[in-house]
């Protein structure tokens, strides 16, 4: 960091402050993770200098020999991780990966079946404020009011009623396994294609701890961060028959030059995910999520759907301790625990207020937190949210957070 320190003290100070925040706080945002130093080094390498429109072996610029090498490595490693016939590693984000699939599979105004955002879906699955909801006719499916789990018979009924051209299976705040085989059966019944957005669970899928959607879906999209623990970016996996359409939709359709420094970092992350240690890590992520869920339930908190099968859980704080998600987020932030307010199914609060918070275990697990540590995290959360105006209790909670972060330092 010495170059930045000497040249731009304001940016250097902000970066150092962010490092201190990450090191001294417990990160529980489910969509975040800590990349390895090798991934960071690749992303900060000379690959950032190279413009490389096109694909390996077919570039519109000279001097692409070595970015061809790293991009090809990324492609082959992603294929090996997920068993995909074709992979495009160029999407700058998960949203752009989703956009590319929509442009291939749909015409403007076509009907699509996607999960309701407030029930655990994603903005790009048809939210009216997102391009997906503006360009296409999305029909929502959600969770059952009693079980708070997806009712596949309701999904089937909606599919038969609305005859979508595409069904989107994927979530951003759903703590249960998705039945991709059942989604595919429903899609086939109505002649729809199936797209799976596995952004949140890609690491679990890569480790063999969640069913793999690749064998069922026509298209699979994901981010490369979150549980996959790579740089921020996107990825598309598809059947060979869609290769040409997907590739030309990414470039030149919606992107120009790929971010080859990010692709190099993706290659490194995919290599890490192929190691046995990665499976051990993902197993711990799930164990920690289950322990956190159980601890909070023992403390009197209601967990949406009653628990978790993956890396995250949604906590109904409004009906547990009578604070909103917004208030809970602020209280936890004040003691050094970072999370995000989140709507829960059938939420009566506005989206910027919410009745819930979403908690995820990947980031803290990366720095070494085990089940005992997450039991303590659950107790600290309970202490703070039950005493949001008690300075003595909040001071105690902050001190307990500091003991945990000191025990499991970041990047050492």
Swiss-Prot record:
One of its GO terms (cellular component) is cytosol. (6S)-5,6,7,8-tetrahydrofolate binds at residues 117, 121-123. Pathway: One-carbon metabolism; tetrahydrofolate interconversion; Amino-acid biosynthesis; glycine biosynthesis; glycine from L-serine: step 1/1. The modification N6-(pyridoxal phosphate)lysine is found at residue 226. Its cofactor is pyridoxal 5'-phosphate. It is found in: Cytoplasm. The record marks 225 as: Plays an important role in substrate specificity. InterPro entries: PyrdxlP-dep_Trfase (IPR015424), PyrdxlP-dep_Trfase_major (IPR015421), PyrdxlP-dep_Trfase_small (IPR015422), Ser_HO-MeTrfase (IPR001085), Ser_HO-MeTrfase-like (IPR049943), Ser_HO-MeTrfase_PLP_BS (IPR019798), SHMT-like_dom (IPR039429). It comes from the Bacteria. Its EC number is 2.1.2.1. GO terms for biological process: glycine biosynthetic process from serine; tetrahydrofolate interconversion. It catalyses: (6R)-5,10-methylene-5,6,7,8-tetrahydrofolate + glycine + H2O = (6S)-5,6,7,8-tetrahydrofolate + L-serine. One of its GO terms (molecular function) is pyridoxal phosphate binding. It is an enzyme of class 2 (transferase). Homodimer. Belongs to the SHMT family. Catalyzes the reversible interconversion of serine and glycine with tetrahydrofolate (THF) serving as the one-carbon carrier. This reaction serves as the major source of one-carbon groups required for the biosynthesis of purines, thymidylate, methionine, and other important biomolecules. Also exhibits THF-independent aldolase activity toward beta-hydroxyamino acids, producing glycine and aldehydes, via a retro-aldol mechanism. This is Serine hydroxymethyltransferase.
